[in-house]
Amino acid sequence: MAVAEQGALAGLRERTEEGHLKAGRVPPSQVEHGRQSGAVKILEERPIDQSIRDYIPPLITEDEKLLRGHGARQPSDDFTRTDPWRVLRITSEFIEGFDTLAPVEKAVTVFGSARVGPDDAQYTAAQETARLLAEAGFAIMTGAGPGIMEAANKGARLGHGRSIGCNIELPFEQGTNPYVDTVINFRYFFVRKTMFIKYSSAFIIFPGGFGTLDELFEALTLIQTGKIYHFPVVMFGRHYWAGLIRWLHARVLQERKISPGDLELMLVTDDPAEAATAVIDAFEARSAAPRV
């Protein structure tokens, strides 16, 4: 290879590395180093209950860049790293999401743990629930990852429905599961959450962790405050959710932090058919309701 060509390639690699760093992602050289040193392999083979924070390098995410405090802007600062520029990037994510999902007439978003394997009963239940809904004409949306998300996307494909994944970009992300037909990548969690709410007719919440709970309580808050109507929230897994339901009754309701009717916003079930029927019935009621 000629010296000039070698120099051009080196410059291209340098710009690529810099671009990844500015975007808060792991640059290719570090990913390759991670593979050679075993770091990526360790991440892929970590115990299922091990915190991912133990394996991800402390890079700054796009959300953190937006939310953390900033000092006075210096004349030498790159404009593309300032908040006004981020507003444009956020707007572009909304536009891409709206444009991609505009043809979706009715969809259900399925949430749940990424740490559930194909042999787990929850995986099977999520797959079956999604299959029933897909056969009824619903698209299935997930966070595009493994576990419950993969099961739901697989069920959508088995039911010959549209399988949608809204992926979030993170360092050493695990990638999109193989059953997603339409994928949208987001830098910002709040943009992705808007897509879930805007294009879903219901949420089905399988057992999961903080992210799953976040989506659960945001949906309940939007219903409670009248922002959305005829929006079923199905919590799948009676045993898993029993402690939370008891706490809501014994503590939150008893101390009058919520109203008795707020506890009727959730359906708890172990039956995929019951979950699917609740969603279908609510959608039909919503469609029949007069437009204001």
List the model feature ranges, each with a label.
Residues M1-V3, V26:
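Hydrophobic alpha-helical signal/anchor motif
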Residues G7-R13, E17-H20:
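Short, intrinsically disordered low-complexity segments enriched in Ser/Thr with adjacent Pro
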Residues G24, G34-C166, G175:
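Glycine-rich beta-alpha loop segments
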Residues L101-P103, L132-A134, A156-R157, Q174-P178, ...:
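Solvent-exposed alpha-helices and their adjacent loops that cap or buttress functional pockets
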Residues G147-F206:
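Acidic/glycine-enriched connector segments
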Residues E169-G175, T212, Y240-G243:
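Short gly/pro/ser/thr-enriched loop/turn and capping motifs at secondary-structure boundaries
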Residues R187-H239, F283-A288:
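Active-site/ligand-binding-proximal alpha/beta "capping" segment
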Residues M235-V292:
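C-terminal functional extensions of proteins
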